[in-house]
Amino acid sequence: MRALRRHAARPLAILALALGGLTVVASPAAAQAEFDHGTFDALLHAHVRNGMVDYDAFAAAPEFAAYLKRLAAFDPTTLSQSDQVAFWIDAYNAYTIQLVNAHHERESIRNINKSFGFIRGYGPWKEKLAVVGGTAYGLDDIEQDILRKRNREPRIHFALVCAAMGCPPLRGEAYVGNRLDAQLDDQARTFLLASPGKNRVDIAAKTVHLSPIFVEFRDYIHDFGGSEAAVGRFISRFYPAGAERDLLASGQFRVEKTPYDWTLNSQANARRAGR
C-alpha cells in the first residue's frame, strides 16, 4: 500500500460542540459533493444485530467490496463538514470490518499483526489498509489525525467501533451528515444506559463505573473535559432526569474502571457467550 501522504491545506468548516449538539460553522467552500452510504447502510441493517457483526456475511458480500472501492476513489474534502465527519466514521467502521476479514481473525482484533504474544510495531490500528481518495490510512490515522484533531466532538468515541465486545455497539445503519447529531446522541445513550457491564452509576456508593474509554485509553479523557468530574458532567446530559444524572453533574463521585473485553464483536462470539 502507498504510504500516508500529507494533504495540502484546504479551508475546512469548524465543528464545535455546543451543549445541545453539533454546531457547524460553514466555510467559504466551492460547491459541495455528496457520497451515498446506502450500500453500507443496507449491509449494516442486514448483518449487524444488537451491535454484533456477521463478519462472514460481510466477507462474502460483493456489495461490500464495491463500497470499499468507492471509498478508495472518493475525495471527502468535497463534502460539507458534517458529511465529512459521517464519512470518516463510516469509513473507519467499514475498514475495521475489512481488517478483521483480511486477516481471517475471529477471536480478537488484537491478534492481528501479533507474534510470540506481542503486537508488532504497527499493530492492527496502524496497518495502511484503509484507502480513501487514493491515500492509504491506518485506522489510527483516521481516528487520531482526522476525526479527533479536526473536530472537537467527543461523541465520536461512541461511534467508532474497534471490533471488540468492550466497544460501543456497532450501529445498524450508516452515519449521515443530516442526522449525525441525533445519531451520535443515540449512540451515547445506548452505550451509557444499556450496557451496565461497561457503564453504570451506583447512587448509594456515590460511585460511577466507567468504560476505560473515558478514563484510561490514550488521552481520551481530555476530549471529555480533562478530569473525572468533567467526564461526569459531559455524560450526565444523556441520562434522564433523576438521581443518577444529578450525581454525575455534581462531580461528587469516585470512578471505578470496568473491565474491557477484547473478544471480537461477532455474532458467533456473542452466541457463545450467551449474549
Show the residue positions of the predicted features:
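Bacterial N-terminal signal peptides that target proteins for export
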Residues: 2-15
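Bacterial N-terminal signal peptides
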Residues: 12-24
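Sec/Tat signal peptide C-region and signal peptidase I cleavage site
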Residues: 25-31
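Interaction/scaffold regions that mediate signaling and macromolecular assembly across diverse proteins
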Residues: 32-275
